[in-house]
Structure formats: structure tokens, C-alpha cells
Curated annotation (Swiss-Prot):
GO terms for cellular component: fungal-type vacuole membrane; Ragulator complex. Residues 16-40 are annotated as: Disordered. It comes from the Eukaryota. GO terms for biological process: regulation of TORC1 signaling. This is Uncharacterized protein C29A10.17. Residues 20-31 have a biased composition (Polar residues).
Length: 153
């Protein structure tokens, strides 16, 4: 290992090899300031809290949209099962033509009307969030014509 400035001081590389690095025995290290100590403690507390959150999150549900930890399973709306119920009802229908029964029973009619009403309400209540695209330009790329002439004038 040579000293890059040895030619300026007329020192040879041998001197650099023989000179050990200075030790820190006589230098007293200053303890961390109270502010640095508090920030270190805060970071340790944050890391501990994060590890607890991750541990709890393994067994709990996380609301990914708000990124808040849920402490219990989300409550399901009873209307959430309507699609499965309708499919079960459709699967259980006997589609063989029966000439003696032309209309569904009153109970079946009420059930179908109620479920279709809930389905229509759900469709009408769907609102798209524009938070993701607010302030961004949305372009249909199939309608964009390339500019062959170069830079716009």
C-alpha cells in the first residue's frame, strides 16, 4: 500500500507500510446526546411495534385499502351471499318442462323478486372512485395518432 502523496513529501512506500494506523485508546468517545438517544429509543419502539403488527397481521385480517389492522373478522353483509343463494336456487331448479305447472309459486316469485331487487340496488350503488386517476391524464391509446413530422411546432 502506497501513500498517494508520498512523492510530495519524499516519503517512500516503506514508511507508509511501517506506520500503523492510529489507535483510539486515548480518545474519549462522547456519549450520544439526549436527542439522539431519544430518536434511537423511538426507532427501537417503532421496530418493536412493527414486529408486533406483522405478527398479529399473520392471523388477522388487514384492510388493504386503509392499511389499518382489523382486530376482528370483517362483518359480512347478509346481502353478500345473495349471489351464491341465487346460483344455488338456479342449480336446484328443475328445468324439465312441466306442462301442469306454468307459473312459479308465490314464495318462489317473492324470493326471486327480492333477490333481483337487491342485485339491482347493488349495481345502482356501485360508484367508481376517481382518487386513483385524479390529476392524471387518461388516454385511449388506440385513438392516438403518432406524430411522424418530429417535434411539434
Amino acid at each position: 500500500m502506497g501513500n498517494c502523496c508520498s512523492f510530495l513529501f519524499n516519503n517512500s512506500d516503506d514508511i507508509d507500510e511501517q506506520t500503523p494506523l492510529l489507535n483510539n485508546d486515548g480518545i474519549q468517545r462522547t456519549p450520544p446526546s439526549a436527542e439522539a438517544d431519544m430518536s434511537l429509543r423511538k426507532r427501537e419502539e417503532e421496530e418493536e411495534w412493527e414486529s408486533k403488527v406483522y405478527d398479529v397481521a399473520k392471523n388477522k385480517f388487514i384492510d388493504v385499502f386503509s392499511l389499518r389492522l382489523r382486530t376482528e373478522a370483517p362483518q359480512r353483509d347478509p346481502r353478500d351471499n345473495i349471489y351464491e343463494e341465487v346460483l344455488d336456487q338456479i342449480d336446484s331448479l328443475n328445468l324439465d318442462p312441466k306442462y301442469d305447472v306454468a307459473k312459479p309459486t308465490e314464495q318462489e316469485t317473492e324470493f326471486i323478486i327480492r333477490k333481483l331487487g337487491v342485485l339491482i340496488d347493488d349495481i345502482n350503488n356501485i360508484k367508481l372512485s376517481d382518487k386513483e386517476i385524479k390529476g392524471k391524464m387518461v388516454i385511449n391509446l388506440s385513438k392516438v395518432q403518432p406524430n411522424i413530422t418530429g417535434s411539434p411546432s
